[in-house]
């Protein structure tokens, strides 16, 4: 390397990009933007410490039904006020119908269905 005037710690790489350029890009599928507002409700569920937030989130998503647009964990807490061996997982639920504005009752029913699924699958209780 010294004969070429290059530092001792030099490397060279050759990339053949033709394989990448020849591949067809996957189609991007976008959801249409709704003209109706979302209804957001939060829920904090107390579960056994062995239940992961991902497991609980998946159960909540399945239980909430077709009106659920998104569900995101925004807090996991174990400490004062939570029984030993348990934790509280707080989840933001966003509901939306593609063809109408949801009523508060519809959003609450979907939330309750999500909570019921978590209760059945993980013994979850609403944090008071």
Which residues fall in each region the model found?
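A carboxyl-terminal module marker
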Residues: 1-128
């Amino acid at each position: 390397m010294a004969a070429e005037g290059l530092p001792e710690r030099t490397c060279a790489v050759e990339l053949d990009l033709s394989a990448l350029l020849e591949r067809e890009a996957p189609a991007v599928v976008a959801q249409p933007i709704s003209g109706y507002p979302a209804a957001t409700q939060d829920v904090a569920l107390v579960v056994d410490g062995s239940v992961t937030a991902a497991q609980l989130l998946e159960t909540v998503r399945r239980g909430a039904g077709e009106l659920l647009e998104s569900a995101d964990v925004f807090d996991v807490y174990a400490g004062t006020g939570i029984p030993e061996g348990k934790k509280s997982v707080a989840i933001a639920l966003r509901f939306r119908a593609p063809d109408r504005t949801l009523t508060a009752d519809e959003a609450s029913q979907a939330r309750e269905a999500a909570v019921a699924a978590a209760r059945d699958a993980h013994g979850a209780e609403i944090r008071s």
